[in-house]
Design a protein with these regions (language model features):
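C-terminal outer-membrane/trafficking sorting elements
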Residues: 19, 568-575, 579-643
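N-terminal, polar/Ser/Thr-rich
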Residues: 23-75, 159-163, 462-463, 467
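A surface-exposed beta-strand-loop module
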Residues: 24-30, 96-157, 531-537, 550
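Glycine/proline-rich low-complexity spacer/linker segments in large multi-domain proteins
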Residues: 53, 130, 139-191, 249, ...
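Hydrophobic helix-coil surface modules that form long, contiguous segments used
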Residues: 76, 167-171, 181-328, 357
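Zinc-dependent metallopeptidase catalytic helix centered on the HExxH motif
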Residues: 317-373, 431
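Acidic/His/Gly-enriched intrinsically disordered linker/tail segments
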Residues: 352-417, 421, 439
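Amphipathic alpha-helical substructures
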Residues: 404-491
Length: 643
């Protein structure tokens, strides 16, 4: 193109900003670290049994464990009651090959079985038809596999090196210590776990403590715990050490529930007690927000274990410390993860996104909106770095399932944005309603939640989940606005990228007298033009887009100015205005400039190439036009009127 020429371009450009942020250690971060270790991930994924035997429906587990920490050995007796989902003569349970089965019986009758490739296959005493039930007892023993993931671990704590034993089965670790059906969707109706150890130990599991049996001859104690609520296999847990007890009581809706905390003696200081005390207020807040605590007839509590972070075992969280955000995160899991569990590990959003978002809700409750936004903005910064969808493409990759930036961070941001789309009243009604829905004490997929949210709120949300949960990326907005006279505002909002996003965006309009008005526009195309002619505050002085930060995005905003009706050639850079035929563009020196012109509806105006800053606009229809001239240093915006 010739020197001094003016070329026609697009009105909208894309400007990307780079943001750097440090990952903050919060409850979600601690939770993710507890659930993922890189050293053994490939090995664990290779032997993952998921989704277990699809032809049976598990009903009941009675698990009797004897644990010998001195040689890291366990002996187990697992009674399973299950029903057949079709005609079967054989059942398959998932159990590591490092634990050897010594017998399998049914009502005292020995059954034929084989153990290979981390599977226990049992021939049933008779063929089962659909709906028939059966009971089998599996006797096994051995040393659980030692993995960095820590499905069943032996450790010590304190200067005295007191032993501590704990389980952490999520996602694929339960077969490392008991024979099970390795599928989070198939919940047991109830469980009983008995733990026998040296009498110096306190042993903790799910539900209510039924008895403590002392065997003086063997110098042992047996703790018997009964859980009467549906429970996913990976939430069955044990934790054993020389715990000191710190017991609280929570009252809600006329009901009383124990909050039982099992803490290392050397850790149980007044400061730690103060941290734990927050649990009671959190129980009330989350019950008000999501519905009554799901296991109120049993308990809630914590058991300290030898890992950093936490694990939301049903009714008793296992954790390594008592930070406020970790307590909030794991408690929220009792609703999102335990009461309603992800149906597949690809749907881990149903667990971790909600628990991470609940941290922000608790921060908002405790400290205010600024604390909430600080939490969310941290997640937004990290979420912008991810390239995978929130719906997990490879659920056998624990690095991906428990990726903090993705599953926890972006997951929380998705819920924040959904709150913005629905509004507070509808959003929290959806959450509380979902907890009381057909999925209560069962499992659900992300799509189940979407369909429920649509039905409950009356809003179509497929577009939202498609782009934010099943898709990747985020919108990049370039927005310009013009105060077009009293009570009039014109906005041109564009987005670029490999895909376009559809999102409602709040617009805060500030008038010269200081009054404000809030409107909402929906940006869903590459170029969007909005003319607002029914304002009530007079002349607009400022416009703020997405003032409450509901959208994960990058955005640049510019203000257009009217060029004036009586321009002087030495004062104005584009004149005359209004113009009939030739518009003069005043530039500081010869060179290459980009001239961008669009009509007020956002359509690109096609002009011939011109020189010497003269633009022939005689063929343009009468009306207002956006004008922009770009130099190497800056861009100058304006509006001219064609008569």
């Amino acid at each position: 193109m010739k020197a001094g020429a003016v070329r026609i371009g697009w009105f909208l450009g894309v400007f990307f900003g780079a943001l750097a942020a440090q990952a903050q250690e919060n409850g979600g971060w601690e939770c993710s670290q507890a659930k993922i270790r890189s050293a053994q991930n490939a090995r664990l994924a290779a032997r993952a049994a998921y989704p277990g035997d699809t032809l049976i429906d598990m009903k009941y587990l009675k698990l009797d464990l004897t644990i010998r920490p001195e040689n890291k050995y366990i002996q187990g007796a697992a009674r399973h009651i299950f029903t057949a989902k079709s005609g079967i003569s054989e059942v398959s349970l998932d159990l590591t090959g490092q634990l050897k089965v010594s017998s399998v019986t049914s009502k005292g009758r020995k059954l034929t079985y084989s153990q290979a490739s981390n599977k226990l296959k049992v021939s049933l005493p008779a063929k089962l038809n659909t709906g028939d039930s059966e009971t089998i007892d599996v006797m096994y023993e051995g040393t659980p596999p030692t993995t960095a993931f820590g499905s069943f671990s032996f450790g010590t704590h304190g200067t005295a090196k007191a032993p501590v034993i704990w389980s952490l089965s999520e996602p694929y670790g339960a077969p490392d210590w008991w024979p099970c059906k390795d599928d989070p969707a198939d919940k047991l109706d109830s469980t009983q776990v008995s733990i026998t150890m040296d009498k110096s130990y306190v042993s903790v599991s799910n539900g209510t403590l039924m008895s403590v049996e002392i065997n003086l001859a063997a110098n042992t104690k047996t703790y018997v715990w009964k859980n009467r609520y549906p429970i996913s296999h990976y939430l069955v847990s044990v934790a054993c050490s020389n715990y000191a007890s710190y017991d609280l009581t929570w009252e809600y809706g006329g009901k009383t529930m124990p909050v039982s905390n099992f803490v290392y003696p050397e850790v149980l200081t007044q400061s730690v007690k103060t941290q734990i005390d927050r649990t009671v207020d959190m129980l009330t807040f989350f019950s008000d927000t999501f519905g009554e605590y799901p296991f109120i007839t049993e308990k809630y509590g914590h058991a300290m274990c030898g890992f950093g972070g936490g694990m939301e075992h049903q009714t008793v969280t296992s954790l390594g410390g008592f930070s406020e955000s970790l307590i909030a995160h794991e408690l929220a899991h009792q609703w999102f993860g335990d009461k309603i569990t992800c149906k597949t590990w690809a749907d881990i959003f149903m667990n971790e996104a909600f628990a991470s978002y609940s941290e922000a809700l608790w921060a908002e409750k405790r400290t205010g909106k600024s604390a909430y936004m600080s939490n969310i903005n941290g997640h937004i910064t990290r979420a912008k770095t991810v390239t995978e969808p929130v719906y997990i493409s490879n659920p056998k990759d624990e690095n991906l399932v428990f990726d903090y930036n993705l599953t926890y961070g972006k997951g929380a941001v998705v819920l924040h944005m959904l709150r913005g789309v629905l509004g507070d009243a509808a959003f929290f009604d959806v959450l509380k309603g979902f907890m009381a829905s057909e999925y209560a004490y069962k499992s659900a997929t992300i799509n189940d939640f979407r369909e429920f949210a649509e039905k409950r709120s009356g809003k179509e949300l497929k577009y939202f989940f498609d782009q934010w949960v099943y898709g990747t990326g985020f919108p990049v907005y370039k927005i310009n606005w013009l105060s077009a006279g009293a009570n009039q505002l014109k906005i041109e909002a564009g987005q670029t990228g490999t895909k376009l996003f559809r999102m409602p965006m709040e617009v805060k309009i500030t008038f010269k007298d200081g009054k404000e008005e809030l409107r909402t526009i929906t940006i869903d195309k590459a170029t969007n033009v909005f003319e607002i002619n029914d304002l009530t505050g007079g002349e607009v002085s400022e416009v703020t887009f997405d003032p409450n930060g509901w959208i994960m995005k990058t955005m640049t905003v510019g203000k257009l100015e009217l060029l004036g009706n009586e321009p002087a050639a030495d004062e104005k850079w584009a004149y005359p205005n209004p113009v009939n035929d030739i518009l003069t563009i005043k530039v500081p020196e010869n060179g290459l400039y980009e001239l961008e012109i669009r009509d007020i509806r956002g359509g690109k105006v096609d002009l011939r190439e011109v020189t010497k800053g003269k633009v022939d606009v005689s063929r343009l229809p009468a009306g207002k036009y956006f004008l922009r001239v770009l130099t190497a240093e800056k861009a100058v915006n304006g509006v001219f009127v064609k008569e």
